[in-house]
């Protein structure tokens, strides 16, 4: 509505008959309306609605900003409050009095415990948070400033190492020996007591995954002040030298030693399998067997087969499953027994026989096998740089036939220099049976070859065709041909010419130095040649020519091996005994004569290897 329209609305025509007084009052009202309208327009303005919305938006934005700042301040205050609480806890923790530790000795029904702490034995109370029934003897416990048990820990992990002499009758104490040979009685922590009680659990000793019973010679972790032994410490010094597992080797795996196998079975198996007959005839079983002969002829292999066969025979006698047959084969690595410290070698020997007696007390046969016996039990007085054999040999003698008898234990020794072993060990009553493992002859060599050349091997088609596809006949012919080639006394097989001290000369062939190890090496070479032939020609199968070529290669590798510096010592190791050898000349085809060497002075035999 315009200004003129508004004026006309409030200005009626004069001819309406209004009085002058009414008109004056109307004008006064009109002026007041105009003043009020001006005031309103001045307060709101012509665009009042738009300005009001803009102000509202600005206010809302400011409110949002203030709200965000307020939230951030609240989060900062919360974080500061948490840090303050953590710092307060840290201050409280740092301000706590120190805690002591002790070893639990015993627990009582009145919720008190005996604890060894600070060199004193004390009876203390326990915190309500501690279950006294769950505490175990030997356990470490934490004490507060009031000497109250507030926490149960683990068992002590550090301390002195002592050797177990024996477990006392109560099963909770043991006699141990310290470093200075001081004997003391200590209590066994509950884990050790539990291990020692496994003797009554069926199959506990046969399960390697479970703890075993304590035995003399074990190393124990001991706290001498508290008087407790906490755990058994593995001993590398003896554990590495002894192999208790029975090797999976049978007499059927050994070729060419039928007579020797029968001898050792008579010496070892008969006394264990027919104890009643031995008692009836008042016959004492042999205590030991010596296997001697040149290297690589099966001494160690026979010893392994003895343990395997004996375990199975004992299982048959007892009616047990032969697959679960159990016996103990203590394989002693001779040279590793030697120790630079005086008395250590003797101590190791004592520990070995202690273990053997313990196993034998269960009624299970135990074989103690000393490989390379000449390295540790030499003739007394022959040492050059030391006289260790003067005490090591008597220690073995006292163990074999000392005051303590060896029941169900037999000692087997192996050596290629039996002349260097002390005679006191070899006398009857100690190593009663002496079996010579000789080099294989042609017949024995065929038997050995048959162990490696079996019908399961792939044979070349051309060789099979010669025998009309008969694989067994082809393998047999291969063995016969390779043995004939190896044992033929032809110029190509000549090896050495030796001159004895009396002037006699003798030509030796490779067959005189053959061994089971050499035969195995020949077969392995032939198999490798067959594989190379497959890769080159694509024709699979083993051929006779592969074996013949392997013999030539094997002989060629051995032509430089004879020791021409000390020929007599070399000959003794190789199995040639008798007249002293002073001169060796190699006769291998193509070998120059410069390889021969004369020995003008006689060497001290048995001194150098």
Curated annotation (Swiss-Prot):
Pfam families, per database record: AAA, Prot_ATP_ID_OB_C, Prot_ATP_ID_OB_N
| Residues that bind ATP | 296-301
Q: Where is this region: Docks into pockets in the proteasome alpha-ring?
A: 608-609
Which keywords are on file for this protein?
ATP-binding, Chaperone, Coiled coil, Nucleotide-binding, Proteasome
Q: Could you tell me which cysteines form disulfide bridges?
A: none
Q: What does this protein do?
A: ATPase which is responsible for recognizing, binding, unfolding and translocation of pupylated proteins into the bacterial 20S proteasome core particle. May be essential for opening the gate of the 20S proteasome via an interaction with its C-terminus, thereby allowing substrate entry and access to the site of proteolysis. Thus, the C-termini of the proteasomal ATPase may function like a 'key in a lock' to induce gate opening and therefore regulate proteolysis.
Family as reported in the entry's similarity comment? Belongs to the AAA ATPase family.
**Protein name from the UniProt record:** Proteasome-associated ATPase
> Which species is this record about?
Mycobacterium leprae (strain TN)
